[in-house]
Regions:
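A glycine-rich dinucleotide-binding beta-alpha-beta segment and adjacent secondary-structure elements
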Residues: 187-201, 355-359, 418-477
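Active-site-proximal substrate-binding core of FAD-dependent oxidoreductases
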Residues: 259, 496-517
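Structural core of flavin- and non-heme-iron oxidoreductases
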Residues: 1-34, 38-40, 45, 115-116, ...
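C-terminal segments that line or cap access tunnels to active or ligand-binding sites in enzymes
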Residues: 322-434
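N-terminal glycine-rich phosphate/pyrophosphate-binding loop and immediately adjacent elements
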Residues: 4-140
Length: 517
């Protein structure tokens, strides 16, 4: 299962990309050591504890379950036996000023009925047409782009072939998501609802390509609630990697990636300890590498992300609160009254929006659809998120500004009928996120997906420095929990392929790895 020489890999960061790569590499006979400066795994998938109650304070939506099922299958394990998941009956509950409310469901037919009641039969029919296009967009891009190791516009066209050129044209890469949605929905609230999917990639619907409508299809394929919270997924991946032989060291801050004879040779920790390795996988934001956070010698490994090209950051409130009135479900969205202004303020003026949309994850609400607050836990664990500019390395967000955000949350919630009585709150700003993820300004999704070519400019696993590889949401195929996991698998596949080509005999096993069709 391994070559005569035992290859050693150091993984910098125990985020989802680093964890999946560690599972793959350790299972194939590579000696793996994961170095993480935080006290626990997960990266952005973090938990904060208030009054002894853990609150997911990072990604809260799990889709594309098959990514993790395939990972565990590839190393001889079963994902379902390691983690308990429940499919959400309602994808999200959406609210607008004036009391209008719309639920989207796991079943397209049920969502169409809800949209019909909300906005009329014609909008319901347009929704079905939109779903068809979202599915076609995903199916067109899944193989030649999402699962491809190093996609380019040329490779995408070549893999599509002459018969597939029409499909590529129909995904409308040169049209913005907002413009494309206008061709489907006449009700501005529905355009706003589905335009929000651009924020899943840290982007503006007014600048992101129409291809991002594929997110709608991904959600319709299933949104899953994780027993124990999203952080339990990180712990499950960590446990699997350990069973395969990977070692983990927490509280280990990497100061430098070593480069000798033009190739990576290991790392140096903040305490001066040198760890040698012939493979270094950086599960860190690519901006940190380009900014020299791991040493000047590796800054050339990947192109920098200009501050103007950064994705969204956020102001988040992890909260325990008594609730009354509005019946929260697991995922809730309270929309602003002027969506274009909201994104103009974030990406143009570089300030927190005056009237932002609010996302709320009510973590004590289950998967079953309810229209009442019966059996609600009190106080509830709530996670509020407001999109913000990634300028955490340029300015400080003062107390007055953050208090204004908090007041807006309470006011907008109350206008929708939700009464909140917070008992404990932890706040995270773009400045805090920049501290957690240096070199990013607090950007949470890498580079913004603005323009048709943005997705192709994300770096792939291989870098300009032999032996140094990348994984994570800022690398290909992009942000989000399943995509970050796929980036780890793609990186592991690239590493194994390179080791195989460099080692004549015996070969490093790659069976069961991710298909790169």
């Amino acid at each position: 299962m391994s070559s005569r020489k035992t290859h050693r890999a150091v993984v910098i960061g125990a985020g989802i990309g680093g964890l999946t790569a560690a599972v793959e590499l350790a299972a194939r006979g590579i000696e793996v050591e994961v170095l993480e400066r935080a006290p626990s795994p997960g990266g952005k998938m973090r938990q904060l504890v208030l009054d002894d109650r853990p609150i997911d304070s990072g990604p809260t939506v799990l889709t594309m379950r098959w990514v993790f099922e395939q990972l565990f299958d590839s190393v001889g394990e079963t994902f379902d036996s390691q983690l308990s998941l429940e499919q959400a009956e309602v994808l999200a509950r959406h609210s607008w000023r004036g009391g209008a409310r719309l639920d989207l469901f796991a079943e397209v037919a049920r969502s169409a009925d809800a949209i019909g009641d909300f906005a009329g039969a014609k909008e319901a029919a347009r929704f079905r047409a939109f779903c068809d296009r979202a599915r076609a967009t995903y199916e067109t891009l899944e193989g030649p782009f999402i699962k491809a190791r190093e996609p380019t516009p040329l490779s995408l066209t070549r893999k599509a072939g002459i018969k597939g050129l029409g499909d590529l044209w129909r995904i409308s890469p040169f049209t913005t998501l907002w413009s494309a949605l206008g061709g489907y929905f006449k009700d501005p609230r529905l355009r706003q609802l589905f335009g929000r999917y651009a924020t899943y990639c840290g982007s503006s619907p007014f600048e992101a390509p129409a291809t991002l409508m594929l997110v709608a299809h991904v959600e319709q394929e299933g949104v899953w609630l994780v027993e124990g919270g999203m952080h339990a997924l990180a712990r499950t991946l960590e446990a699997c990697a350990k069973r395969k032989g990977a070692a983990f060291r927490y509280g280990s801050d990497v100061r430098e990636i070593l480069v000798e004879h033009s190739a990576s040779r290991g790392v140096v920790l903040a305490n001066g300890e040198r760890i040698e390795a012939d493979i270094v996988l950086a599960n860190a934001d690519v901006s940190a590498i380009a900014a020299g956070k791991f040493g000047a010698s590796v800054a050339v490994a990947t192109p920098p992300v200009a501050p103007k090209s950064r994705s969204l950051s956020a102001v988040t409130f992890s909260m325990l609160a008594k609730t009354d009135g509005f019946p929260l479900t697991r995922h809730n969205v309270f929309f602003s009254t002027n969506y274009r202004r909201e994104f103009d303020e974030i990406f143009g003026a570089k300030r927190i929006p005056t009237n932002p949309t609010i996302y709320v994850c009510a973590q004590d609400r289950g998967a079953v659809w309810r229209q009442s607050n019966d059996n609600a836990v009190s106080p509830e664990r709530l996670f509020f998120l407001i999109n913000a500019p990634a300028v955490g390395d340029m300015r400080t967000f003062g107390t007055e500004e953050i208090e204004r955000c908090r007041d807006h949350i309470l006011d907008l919630s109350q206008r929708a009928g939700l009464i909140l009585e917070p008992t404990a709150t932890a706040i995270t700003t773009p400045q805090d996120f920049n501290g957690l993820f240096p070199g990013t300004g607090g950007a949470l999704y890498g580079q913004a997906s603005h323009g048709w070519n943005a997705s192709f400019t994300r770096p792939t696993a291989r870098t300009k420095i032999p032996g140094l590889y990348l994984a994570g949401g800022s690398a290909h195929p992009g942000p989000g929990v399943p995509m970050a996991a796929m980036s780890g698998r793609l990186a592991a596949a690239s590493i194994l392929e390179d080791l195989t080509s460099a080692t004549p005999s015996p070969r490093v096993a790659t069976s069961g790895g991710m298909s790169m069709a």
